[in-house]
Amino acid sequence: MKIGFIGLGNVGGKLAGSLIRNGYDVLVRDLDTSLEQDFVDSGASRGENPAQMTRACNLLITCLPSPAISAEVMEGKDGALGEMCAGKIWAEMSTTDDQEVRRLGQKVVDAGGEPIDCPVSGGCHRAATGNISIFAGTERSTFDKVLPVLTTIGRRVLHTGPLG
């Protein structure tokens, strides 16, 4: 599975690093492009923009600091939604709210993709060691598809029901 990872901050950087260390093919992107180089040096590729990353990947993970930034990544110029289609999964691990996740998730569904919200618990230190807890809201079939990825970055992964 090819993974796009947008948001390489305190938590996102640790999660993306776990995926790279465990052999996943990962494209990375951050508003602060200086954060990308360490991941590229570790074997990741640099993504051009959310649309290109969605086109190139099966799974797009966003781990961003606010609902507004998530909306921009998904709906803005060169946003991920423009390339979302059947066979594409969007995993939202950002700091956001349930209404915004459901709103963007419905747009993903309308485009033919599959959304999953994956809030985490455990902080940066646990994210660095793959010891966080992940609470996944989505359809069971989508959960089953991404479970191998989620168990790479988290020790406890729980399917909590539908999106949001």
Which residues does each predicted region cover?
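NAD(P)+-binding Rossmann beta1-loop-alpha1 motif at the extreme N-terminus of oxidoreductases
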Residues: 1-63, 88, 93
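Rossmann-fold dinucleotide-binding core
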Residues: 8, 95-164
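Hydrophobic alpha-helical segments typical of transmembrane helices
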Residues: 15, 35, 49, 69, ...
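Short amphipathic alpha-helical segments
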Residues: 16-18, 40, 72-75, 102-106, ...
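A short acidic, helix-capping loop that chelates divalent metal ions and anchors anionic groups
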Residues: 35-36, 70, 125-129
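Acidic, glycine-centered active-site loop in nucleotide-sugar glycosyltransferases
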Residues: 41-43, 76-77, 85-87, 128-131
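Rossmann-fold NAD(P) dinucleotide-binding segment
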Residues: 50-115
